């Protein structure tokens, strides 16, 4: 199979990268009607599969699960997830032939095998859905021309898809229709109905394309969402220990600090996060983050270039074919890092202390979010897509580190995200080696404000605030967060 994106002309590539429209809630006024009475069969019952299925069923839709015969016979976790929640479970041969909508929610590396197995069983005129377009865009999977192909991609882990739905809300979602597979022109109707069924219409929906979703998703997860959080965790911990900070304190500051710091990012963007610092600390964090952006920009651009060209997918799929040799080696090595092996200390850290003693972490978040956004938009990805794949998802990933450190983050994210995370981390740590030699405990481990009078140059502070607040990610972020807030108010 040929990489689909690379078969397109330059103009077609730019057109598909640029598909991005924030949809008005009125566009979802038909609710789930387009799928009412239709048989929905979900392939796979992991976190996304189970939680999306629960939401769809609670929205009045007919949902069942199909698994490989061996998974059913051996009662694997996927079988238990579905059966213990009262869903009908059957083999491909039993359920696929009568399905109107088949939703593929298996791991990325299984998509080619799964789709190749189910497609011959799918009835004429049925619909196939993905929550990530890697199989279509990067692997170039060819779907039978009578089959409609859609994508509904919630921008959060599966557990949050369910929890937000139970609260009467949802999570921001991207929807798309593959232009090569919309024979009856009903793809958008099905995608919108599916999105309503998961609750996504209540939190903000972007009309996207398979290409835009894949190229932006890969970039975000490799750089700021996973890669830089892993690099930052290891470097900050090692620096604190080197400078004599208690290991338990250092471990706790990092493990829970990302979550605390990015919570303000979620509500107020980069400006809201930086506003949690004192004026002198804000100026220092700004200066540090500017230096980090200059150092890391070539690496971010290389990752984006390799994603756009298909080089990243090529080397990752080679590792798939080699039994994940590199992935498993890198995963094991991460588990042996000092940060990962050091338990969080039994010490109380107040919320503000995470900011005051973690200035370098704040600077890394600002640098990483802005760089990811800038690099994506330079490549033709629209601001809204770039926002969701950078700033919006950072708090969600930070939450996984708070639970069980980097192991949990890498367990929860997709296989493509984990592979890209390790590639970035291995390149970024040596890139930052000279910078880290200049770092002391005033910006990581101890309070930057200690012994200072809190005075700053007014013009410098004004200039810093202006740069922060005028960045394009702040402008589009404010609009998208306001839309989400308005919808949440309507729902509640």
Swiss-Prot record:
GO MF, any single term: ketol-acid reductoisomerase activity
GO cellular component: cytosol
Cofactor note: Binds 2 magnesium ions per subunit.
Record domain KARI N-terminal Rossmann: where: 17-208
Gene3D superfamilies to which the protein is assigned, alphabetical: N-(1-d-carboxylethyl)-l-norvaline Dehydrogenase, domain 2, NAD(P)-binding Rossmann-like Domain
BP-aspect Gene Ontology terms: isoleucine biosynthetic process; L-valine biosynthetic process
UniProt cofactor(s): Mg(2+)
PROSITE patterns on file: KARI_C (PS51851), KARI_N (PS51850)
Binding site for substrate: 414
Domain KARI C-terminal knotted: 209-353, 354-487
Catalyzed reactions per annotation: (2R)-2,3-dihydroxy-3-methylbutanoate + NADP(+) = (2S)-2-acetolactate + NADPH + H(+); (2R,3R)-2,3-dihydroxy-3-methylpentanoate + NADP(+) = (S)-2-ethyl-2-hydroxy-3-oxobutanoate + NADPH + H(+)
EC number assigned by the record: 1.1.1.86
Ligand binding (Mg(2+) 2): 217, 389, 393
One Pfam family cited in the UniProt record for this chain: KARI_C
Keywords from the UniProt entry: Amino-acid biosynthesis, Branched-chain amino acid biosynthesis, Magnesium, Metal-binding, NADP, Oxidoreductase, Repeat
Catalytic site: 132
Residues the record lists as binding Mg(2+) 1: 217, 221
InterPro entries (alphabetical): 6-PGluconate_DH-like_C_sf (IPR008927), 6PGD_dom2 (IPR013328), KARI (IPR013023), KARI_C (IPR000506), KARI_N (IPR013116), NAD(P)-bd_dom_sf (IPR036291)
Pathway assigned to this chain's UniProt record: Amino-acid biosynthesis; L-isoleucine biosynthesis; L-isoleucine from 2-oxobutanoate: step 2/4; Amino-acid biosynthesis; L-valine biosynthesis; L-valine from pyruvate: step 2/4
Residues binding NADP(+), per UniProt: 45-48, 68, 76, 78, 108-110, 158
Family from the record: Belongs to the ketol-acid reductoisomerase family.
Biological function: Involved in the biosynthesis of branched-chain amino acids (BCAA). Catalyzes an alkyl-migration followed by a ketol-acid reduction of (S)-2-acetolactate (S2AL) to yield (R)-2,3-dihydroxy-isovalerate. In the isomerase reaction, S2AL is rearranged via a Mg-dependent methyl migration to produce 3-hydroxy-3-methyl-2-ketobutyrate (HMKB). In the reductase reaction, this 2-ketoacid undergoes a metal-dependent reduction by NADPH to yield (R)-2,3-dihydroxy-isovalerate.
Protein name: Ketol-acid reductoisomerase (NADP(+))
């Amino acid at each position: 199979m040929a990489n689909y994106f690379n078969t397109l002309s330059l103009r077609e590539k730019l057109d598909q990268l640029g598909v991005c429209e924030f949809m008005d809630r009125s566009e979802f006024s038909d609710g789930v009607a387009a799928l009412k009475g239709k048989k929905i069969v979900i392939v796979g019952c992991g976190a996304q599969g189970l939680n999306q299925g629960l939401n769809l069923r609670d929205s009045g839709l007919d949902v069942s699960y199909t698994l490989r015969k061996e998974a059913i016979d051996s009662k694997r976790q996927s079988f238990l997830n579905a059966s213990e929640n009262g869903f009908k479970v059957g083999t491909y041969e039993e359920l696929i032939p009568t399905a109107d909508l088949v939703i593929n929610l298996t791991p990325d590396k299984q998509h080619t095998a799964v789709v190749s197995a189910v497609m011959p069983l799918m009835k004429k005129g049925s619909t196939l859905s993905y929550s990530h377009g890697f199989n279509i865009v990067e692997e170039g999977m060819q779907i039978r021309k009578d089959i409609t192909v859609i994508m509904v991609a919630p921008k959060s882990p599966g557990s949050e898809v369910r929890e937000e739905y139970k609260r009467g809300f949802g999570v921001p979602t991207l929807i798309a229709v593959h232009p090569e597979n919309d024979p009856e022109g009903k793809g958008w109707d099905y995608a919108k109905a599916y999105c309503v069924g998961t609750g996504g219409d209540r939190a903000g929906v972007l009309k996207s394309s398979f290409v835009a979703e894949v190229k932006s998703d890969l970039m975000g997860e490799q750089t700021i969402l996973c890669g830089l959080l892993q690099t930052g965790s290891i470097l900050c911990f090692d620096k604190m220990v080197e400078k004599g900070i208690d290991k338990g304190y250092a471990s706790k500051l990092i493990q829970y600090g990302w979550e605390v710091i990015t919570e303000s990012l979620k509500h107020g963007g980069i400006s809201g996060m930086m506003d949690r610092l004192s004026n002198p600390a804000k100026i220092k964090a700004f200066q540090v983050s500017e230096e980090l952006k200059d150092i890391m920009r070539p690496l971010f651009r290389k990752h984006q270039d390799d994603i756009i060209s298909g080089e990243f997918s090529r080397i990752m799929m080679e590792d798939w074919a080699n039994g994940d040799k590199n992935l498993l080696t890198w995963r094991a090595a991460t588990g042996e890092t000092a940060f990962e092996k050091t338990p969080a200390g039994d010490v109380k850290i107040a919320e503000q202390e995470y900011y005051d003693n973690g200035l370098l972490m704040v600077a890394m978040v600002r640098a990483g979010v802005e760089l990811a956004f800038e690099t994506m938009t330079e490549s033709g990805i629209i601001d809204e897509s770039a926002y969701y794949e950078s700033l919006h998802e950072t708090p969600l990933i930070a939450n996984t580190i708070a639970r069980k450190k980097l192991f949990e983050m890498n367990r929860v994210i997709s296989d493509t995200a984990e592979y890209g995370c390790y590639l970035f981390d291995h390149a970024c740590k040596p890139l930052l080696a000279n910078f880290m030699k200049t770092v002391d405990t005033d910006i990581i481990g101890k309070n930057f404000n200690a012994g200072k009078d809190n005075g700053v140059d007014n013009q410098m502070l004004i200039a810093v605030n202006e740069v922060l607040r005028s960045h394009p990610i702040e402008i589009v972020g404010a609009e998208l967060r306001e839309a989400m807030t308005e919808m949440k108010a309507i729902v509640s």
